[in-house]
Amino acid sequence: MMGVPSEAELADYMQRAINEGADPELVKKMAGGKTGIVATLKTDKPGKTVAFRFDMDCNDVEEERCDEHRPAKEGFASEHKKAMHACGQDGHVTIGLSAAKLLAANKARLAGTVKLIFQPAEEGVRGAFAMMNAGVVDDVDYLFGGHIGFKATTDNCLVTMTDGFLATTKLDAEFTGVSAHAGAAPEQGKNALLA
């Protein structure tokens, strides 16, 4: 799998989860970085398989601790260094769990199968690639995904469609320059990033 931390890091994360109250048996199932979860609701009526994807990774970002930062001010900032839900993943998980509750409550009114895919490692499509290779979407007829990222100007719901926001493109670039002392002789350098 792409982007999985080292065995030592995984062991530390797993122990931390147990120390913070996670069920040790569930944590064991996540060995090797397998943290994705798929919930499947099979109705009693035939029909298509519809899946909804909710990414749930955290980013390798240090969360701000100052009082002006709303999560710090209100007490819901990340407790762990370099592990921040900077792109709304906690919101995505909340939406997914709420959808699960609503779908289960309305199962008799539904047809076919519904899959709720809680996907790790959204950044760089690593998690999607691993889950696809594991066969999670092989039987899916329709797949919906979303991402928190726009600010509504009213209290109404905001839904957008786009060709670029929910996509990823990778580019390898190599920059070559000449280093120089920034204070003593900056004119001797060639900053390739400014070129």
Give each language-model segment a name:
Residues 77-81, 90-91, 103, 108-195:
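Histidine/acidic-residue-rich, glycine-tolerant segments that coordinate divalent metal ions
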Residues 1-85, 94-98, 102, 109-110:
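Acidic/His- and Gly-rich active-site-bordering loop/insert found
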